[in-house]
Amino acid sequence: MKDLGGLMKQAQAMQQKLADAQARLAELTVEGTSGGGMVTVTLRGNGELAKVVLDESLIEPGEGEVIADLIVAAHADAKKKLDAQQAQLMQEAAGPMAGMMGGLPGMKF
């Protein structure tokens, strides 16, 4: 029974670490860029698009398609960075138990 009690304590500690990591993720913001910095997008920790900044040189007639492509590319860049930071935070929170949890739904490690 001592082992079960220890396991329960470990599970509770990990649950708290994961809750803390999720709180940090909620506060996280990342930027992605494209076009050599002509387009910058900011994503929140939940993946929500928070901001788009366009270089003034893009705002000319006939540039709509280019702008749209650059926004999509900047968003993809930001999403890639966000996914990496989320995975790192969750890996840190789970510690040595991360390998055992990799197959659980909603857990990216």
Curated annotation (Swiss-Prot):
Homodimer. It comes from Caulobacter sp. (strain K31). The lineage of its organism: Bacteria, Pseudomonadati, Pseudomonadota, Alphaproteobacteria, Caulobacterales. PANTHER family: NUCLEOID-ASSOCIATED PROTEIN YBAB (PTHR33449:SF1). Keywords: Cytoplasm, DNA-binding. This is Nucleoid-associated protein Caul_4574. Belongs to the YbaB/EbfC family. The keyword DNA-binding applies. Its main location: cytoplasm. NCBIfam families: DNA_YbaB_EbfC, PRK14625.1. GO terms for molecular function: DNA binding. The keyword DNA-binding applies. It holds the Pfam family YbaB_DNA_bd. Binds to DNA and alters its conformation. May be involved in regulation of gene expression, nucleoid organization and DNA protection. GO terms for cellular component: bacterial nucleoid; cytosol. It is found in: Cytoplasm, Nucleoid.
